[in-house]
């Protein structure tokens, strides 16, 4: 049984930890608001970009489609870009993304496909290196970036497109966590090469559009930008999801610390009461002996 001194030290230690988790919860809450606003602001742009691509791509035939949309015509080598956080203390946020990545990679391998991996975020590599360390061809960390910008996503997109143009892979899939709410983040996989151009919505108005330069040249310029936009959106969604998961995890940790403090305090009071009672009995017994 721990002594009263040990219990006092444990209570003080847990209280110090509780202060830290509470502070981290408040910081995550402040960052969450900014990250959520950025993620929600990026969605309309990404959706509008899809609509523009759908309209332009509808006017060209498959033979005229740029390579990033037409693909290589093969399905042998797959590049998987796994986006996670650079830091932990976010509950199951990173492990859920890694779980989806493992399932996707193993499914490809079971079908005889060769897999290459790029990890964006330190935790992604840490979680995947045991099973797929030899498949990782590049590691990208953004821990020094205070606020994710389009330039970060554009650099990743250029790296991926460069690998495609060098014949390093046939299909590229992006895996990240889509932000739904503070307590809900959805691991998502999205094919970005060959670019999955959505069908144009709505009924045809009969209008005839002329593109200058031709539609193929416009697509050749738009698709690389769209790949960067989709990666940027994934990074923003990830950032919002990470802050939401971290805020929830720190809130739970703060609550658990409070419960532990209460239990330790009760134990401390009981032992102190027992010790006082024992001392009183000893004093009374001594007085009676006299």
Swiss-Prot record:
Q: Where in the cell is the protein located?
A: Cell inner membrane
Sorted alphabetically, the keyword list is:
ATP synthesis, Cell inner membrane, Cell membrane, CF(1), Hydrogen ion transport, Ion transport, Membrane, Transport
Gene3D superfamilies noted in UniProt: 3.40.1380.10, ATP synthase, gamma subunit, helix hairpin domain
List the GO biological process terms: proton motive force-driven plasma membrane ATP synthesis
Report if keyword rRNA processing is assigned: no
Task: Please verify whether the record's keywords include Membrane.
Answer: yes
**PROSITE patterns (alphabetical):** ATPASE_GAMMA (PS00153)
Main localization category: membrane
Q: Which family does it belong to?
A: Belongs to the ATPase gamma chain family.
Note the subunit structure: F-type ATPases have 2 components, CF(1) - the catalytic core - and CF(0) - the membrane proton channel. CF(1) has five subunits: alpha(3), beta(3), gamma(1), delta(1), epsilon(1). CF(0) has three main subunits: a, b and c.
What functional role does this protein have? Produces ATP from ADP in the presence of a proton gradient across the membrane. The gamma chain is believed to be important in regulating ATPase activity and the flow of protons through the CF(0) complex.
- The protein here is known as ATP synthase gamma chain
| UniProt gene name | atpG
């Amino acid at each position: 049984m721990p002594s009263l001194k040990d219990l006092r030290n444990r209570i003080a230690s847990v209280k110090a930890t509780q202060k830290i988790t509470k502070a981290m919860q408040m910081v995550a809450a402040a960052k969450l608001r900014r990250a959520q606003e950025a993620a929600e602001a990026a969605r309309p742009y990404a959706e509008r970009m899809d609509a523009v691509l759908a309209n332009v791509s509808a006017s060209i035939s498959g033979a005229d489609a740029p390579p990033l949309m037409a693909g290589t015509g093969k399905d042998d080598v797959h590049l998987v870009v796994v986006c996670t956080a650079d830091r932990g203390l976010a509950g199951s946020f990173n492990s859920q993304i890694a779980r989806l990545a493992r399932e996707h990679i193993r499914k490809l391998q079971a079908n005889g496909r060769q897999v290459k991996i790029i990890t964006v975020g330190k935790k992604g590599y840490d979680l995947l290196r045991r099973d797929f360390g030899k498949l990782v061809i590049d590691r990208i960390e953004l821990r020094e970036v205070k606020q994710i910008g389009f330039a970060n996503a554009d650099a990743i997109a250029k790296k991926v497109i460069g690998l495609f143009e060098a014949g390093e892979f046939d299909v590229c899939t992006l895996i990240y966590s889509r932000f739904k709410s503070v307590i809900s983040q959805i691991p998502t996989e999205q094919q970005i090469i060959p670019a999955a151009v959505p069908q144009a919505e709505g009924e045809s108005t009969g209008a005839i559009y002329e593109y200058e330069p031709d539609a193929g040249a416009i697509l050749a310029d738009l698709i690389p930008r769209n790949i960067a936009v989709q990666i940027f959106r994934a990074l923003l969604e990830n950032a919002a999801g990470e802050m939401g998961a971290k805020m929830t995890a720190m809130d739970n940790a703060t609550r658990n610390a409070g419960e532990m403090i209460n239990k330790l305090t009760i134990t401390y009071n009981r032992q102190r009461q027992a010790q006082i009672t024992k001392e009183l009995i000893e004093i009374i017994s001594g007085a009676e002996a006299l």
